Design a protein with these regions (language model features):
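C-terminal extensions of enzymes
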Residues: 2-5, 318-419
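Short beta-strand/loop segments at the ligand-binding rim of alpha/beta enzyme cores
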Residues: 38-49, 158-163, 175, 180-188, ...
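Catalytic alpha/beta core domains of metabolic enzymes, predominantly
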Residues: 187, 192-337
């Protein structure tokens, strides 16, 4: 596998320099304490990541058994809204305008976001000497070339510690394949089903795939389709099994399964043995407070969690989350034979239509706005017959991040107006 090297423009080189120039870099935290229950999770094969971009919050919860932190548009926006990055924003805007005086406001915002995201992540690297996931601006989610370019640029800032998060879209599958061919570590995010991750693993070979399990429980409960219990857990374990099967059959596949969007400490116990947990602070605090003993924690990889649905719920629509049927496997193999680096998003949409697998809904701009207005948890009845549940959840997540990114961008616009 090639290691990414890129020829940077003058502006890109400046932005890389500004991204690495971390004023007041945090000191390395003292050697953290060990937690026996977390150590047991490590022994079962689970890597533990902390899901926060807030350094002070992370410092209180960090333990020796943890190896990475995840940031995203929402978490980065929370940091930016504190004012911590105002000076960085002003300096970056001034320097970029010196190099490119006629730059548009939109392009300048994208450049500043890149630098700020790097600073948020590098502060965590400085304090914890850990891997950190950095997420792309959602505006590039359907643009293969821009996605790959930003992945290369993030990787160039810190190739040893940065993992680039790329959102799950038809173009995303293709961009991930290209970025992985360059040797860039990728966290393919916003996954909600085993079949999405099966396709990603064989076609694109990211380092990580996700199931946002807490939101799956919520969408079933909030839409009164069932009690919502174990929907996300069942999907995560099904995806984990599929990823492990592909890893065993293809030694060159590095993909690990992430259990994301965890809501409570019990899910850490119920999913013990999954490759990676990315855990929000609230769930970690709860886990510590409950005082779990190592002997209570055993592998749950073969657990068959039962999902209770209401009699009037469309079971097939929900079961698609954890089901990978033969037709979908044929679709995946067909696309993999063609090679992810050779495909476009439209190629994936066309194949999905030909096979009748209904993975990609191709929402209109008006539909995206409607989804965005509803937030992370959509109204499923509205999309009956229009969108599969996994794709609807992915689009809802992407639109939710867009809302947070807009708040992030708006703060930058206000600051650069006076820079």
């Amino acid at each position: 596998m090639a290691i990414a090297t890129i020829n940077m423009t003058r502006k890109e080189a400046l932005l890389a320099e500004l991204a690495r120039d971390l004023p007041h870099a945090p000191a390395r935290i003292p050697m953290p304490a060990s937690d026996p229950a977390l150590a047991k999770l490590n022994q079962l094969g689970t890597h533990l990541w902390l899901d926060t971009g807030n350094l002070e919050e992370a410092s209180k919860l960090w333990r020796r058994e943890m190896s990475a932190l995840t940031t995203n548009n929402t978490l980065a926006n929370q940091v930016v809204q504190t004012g911590l990055m105002d000076e960085v924003i002003q300096q970056t805007a001034r320097r970029v305008r010196e190099v490119e005086p006629g730059i548009s406001e939109d392009d300048l915002v994208m450049d500043v976001v890149f630098v700020v995201n790097c600073h948020v992540a590098l502060r965590l690297v400085s304090a914890f000497d850990a891997l950190v996931s950095v997420e792309l601006h959602p505006a590039v989610g359907h643009d293969i070339e821009k996605t790959v370019r930003y992945a290369q640029r993030y990787y160039a800032v810190n190739p040893d510690r940065f993992i680039v998060k790329i959102p799950l879209t038809p173009e995303g599958y293709c961009a991930v394949a290209r970025a992985r061919a360059d040797g860039i570590p990728i966290n393919y995010t916003l996954g909600f089903s085993a079949r999405q991750n099966y396709l990603a693993t064989l076609l694109s070979r990211p380092n990580y795939v996700n199931v946002f399990l807490g939101r799956l429980n919520a969408v079933v409960a909030d839409n009164k389709l069932g009690d919502g219990k174990y929907v996300g857990e069942k999907t995560t374990l099904a995806s984990q099994a599929a990823v492990r099967e592909l890893r065993a059959a293809h030694p060159d596949i590095p993909t690990l399964q992430i259990a994301a969007s965890m809501r409570n400490a019990q899910q850490m116990v119920d999913l013990a043995g999954v490759d990676v947990f990315t855990i929000p602070p609230k769930a970690v605090e709860e886990f510590y407070a409950q005082g779990h003993k190592p002997e209570e924690i055993t592998s749950r990889l073969h657990e068959q969690y039962e999902v209770h649905l209401n009699d009037d719920a469309d079971r097939s629509r929900i079961e698609v989350l954890w089901t990978i049927d033969d037709t979908f496997k044929k679709l995946t193999q067909d696309l993999a034979n063609r090679g992810g680096v050779n495909l476009t998003g439209d190629d994936l949409r066309a194949a999905d239509k030909d096979y009748g697998t209904k993975l990609f809904s191709d929402f209109t701009a008006e539909e995206q706005a409607e989804i965005r207005a509803k937030g992370k948890i959509p109204e499923t009845a509205r999309w009956t017959g229009r969108a599969s549940l996994d794709d609807l959840m992915t689009e809802s997540a992407l639109q939710s991040f867009t809302t947070d990114q807009n708040a992030f961008d708006d703060r930058i616009r206000k600051i650069i107006a006076s820079a």
